[in-house]
Design a protein with these regions (language model features):
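Bacterial N-terminal signal peptides that target proteins for export
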Residues: 1-6
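Hydrophobic alpha-helical targeting segments used for export or membrane insertion
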Residues: 7-16
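Cyclophilin-like peptidyl-prolyl cis-trans isomerases
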Residues: 16-267
Length: 267
């Protein structure tokens, strides 16, 4: 099940977390969805998909997402929304976007937590990624890390049609891990609060009574009093590293990057 942990749950495994282990969200890259099941907060990561993130913020600022249905919600898979016609295939007035299925970023911008002979895995902010192995990277003239978003629970992607370059306005939230989507759909960020609301959405294709995105805003555009007052466990900090190591010990060979769930607290 997809969960986001608030401070009460987080404290169970993070008693030693210091103030420096937490970080604030960037209001310009935080999307706030007011839904019929409650508030959902998404941390957008332009490092993964600058054009996709720019488009989603533009549509939020234009009010395109307000009132749209979660028109396809599948248990153990995804919740889709964002089409102005409230069904698959709808688009905004803006042109389709090129695929952003992989990225290249400075290695210092990423936190690697798993090193294998065939790949590396880690986080940029709260969003998980997989990257080529260090050995393969060393063979390339470009020193930047080459990776792609990992479709773990809570990850947000852009929907499309059969054409890889047909992403436009549709977004979807993973209700469970589906790594087969890696390299196939643009990753734009991850839910950092409100996972319970995503899990509570009415299920169906379409649901009999669909839930709605009542209002979608970029946090920077909200009055200070209405912005999410959240801090996220910093993936670059000691407490995060210790948390990941504890999961590795507990899960052994079965450990997956998708086992690492978002930890947040109210500030």
């Amino acid at each position: 099940m997809f969960r986001t942990f608030g401070i009460a749950a987080a404290a169970l495994g993070l008693m030693g977390a210091a103030p420096a282990d937490w970080r604030a969200l960037d209001p310009e890259n935080t999307l706030v969805l007011e839904t019929t099941k409650g508030r959902v907060v998404v941390e957008l990561r332009p490092e993964f998909a600058p054009k996709g993130v720019e488009r989603i913020k533009l549509l939020a600022r234009e009010g395109v997402y307000d009132g749209l249905q979660f028109h396809r919600v599948i248990d153990g898979f995804v919740a889709q929304t964002g089409n102005p016609n409230n069904r698959d295939g709808g688009t905004s007035r803006h042109p389709d976007l090129p695929p952003e299925f992989s990225f290249r970023i400075p290695a210092a911008a990423a936190t690697v937590v798993v090193e294998r002979s065939d790949a590396r895995e880690g986080f940029v902010g709260a969003t998980p990624f997989q990257a080529v192995s260090a050995a393969e990277q060393a063979l390339r003239p470009d020193p930047r890390l080459r990776g792609w978003g990992a479709y773990c629970p809570g990850v947000v992607g852009m929907g499309r049609q059969a054409d890889p370059g047909s992403a436009n306005s549709e977004i979807f939230v993973m209700r469970a891990a589906a790594r087969r989507l890696d390299h196939e759909y643009t990753v734009v960020g991850r839910v950092v609060a409100g996972g319970e609301a995503v899990q509570g959405l009415a299920v169906g294709e379409p649901p009999k009574v669909p839930d709605l995105m009542l209002k979608v805003r970029v946090a920077a555009d909200l009055p200070e009093s209405e912005r999410p007052r959240l801090e996220i466990l910093d993936e670059r900090g000691r407490a995060f590293r210790e948390h990941v190591e504890s999961l590795k010990r507990a899960n052994g060979a079965a450990f997956s990057i998708c086992d690492v769930e978002v930890r947040s607290r109210v500030r």
